[in-house]
């Protein structure tokens, strides 16, 4: 058993280094050319944020493996060299909260500051915004912790009677012993239903911070994850359905390119007008609304340009480029089909294991256990993959709603074309939702992840916090997740096969 524990510690160290390398790789390949050789602090924050997010997801499988290392021990501390998972959980999620509510906002305010101002003024402005945010968050946390930062555990009050101590022992004999030989039953076994009571204790402040961050993340996760779990595979499938069927002629290309050029000039003129308003200090609600609308138009314009380049490949290897385009859409269809199976499995598991009481089946829990029986880490790997899939669905849902809803700012993630503010926003969203993904997975896979430190934090403590426990008692987030997934499915069934019509002339709202 000790050898297994040593191997677990070594694997955890190696995986941590690999996660850091993956974070650097994603930054290098997704960053926009305009951010090359600059914006080093935001890049450091992005690498740190991605690393923390990935490690937080991987910690749940590590927690399960850590529990299995002690499965023959009477209590968890009886075996040596195990990972201190509860301490690691709290450390990671405190770091998560600091990044989301302090460090990433500071980096975004600094990066998006007026480039005409000096570095000192941009730093001062960013620090001022973050200080105000920190004071507000601190006051909210302190007040809530002081008023309702308690845990209410529902327990059953049990007691048993005892035999009366006799005054004399002379009356006892072999035929009449001191304690009757008739079958005895503990009085606690026959305790009435009204013996339930509430045991109240003060939650620790780190656990309370994690709990509130989980609530905020759960709201975002329910919305974006519920939409994304459906739009992620269906978007890929309908992208294949709407694919270009053949190469267009040169005259058609010139006509379409001319229209896109005209659109680009309109958007450039609008961007210059908004920049002048920003310099004059007119950054009100109307200005922010116009900036969001302009950002969405730019994303749509880039998509139209990419689609036009696909339909009319140029250069000496035009035929090879077209063949790669066709293969790319076939790949989208295959990945979409696989993703659809995973999404259906997720929704089915939520319904039959979480929403139906008692559960019809443990479903995915049983699959993971059987995979562990085939090979020690196979079930753990599948478990981690299902958790990662939820995070990818969150990003897909945010992208879809960002294009459809006016009040959501879109921050696209594109290979070789992601600006640092979009990077920071999506990393913050991933960090915030990663807490909820872990809580969601710990609940959905409670059978597989039983007796882990994650279940102690997210299962017992979180679901017993005063004022918050009812959201989990009545499965509010799970119902919302499934409902949004079904609504998104209907949306794609009705509108998914239609090609997007070109937008008209862009005008700033007055």
From Swiss-Prot:
The chain crosses the membrane at residues 8-28, 44-64, 89-109, 128-148, 221-241, 336-356, 375-395, 427-447, 476-496. Signal peptide: none annotated. It is a multi-pass membrane protein. Its main location: membrane. Residues 252-317 form a coiled coil. Keywords: Coiled coil, Membrane, Transmembrane, Transmembrane helix. GO terms for cellular component: membrane. It is found in: Membrane. Belongs to the LIMR family. This is LIMR family protein Os06g0128200. It comes from Oryza sativa subsp. japonica.
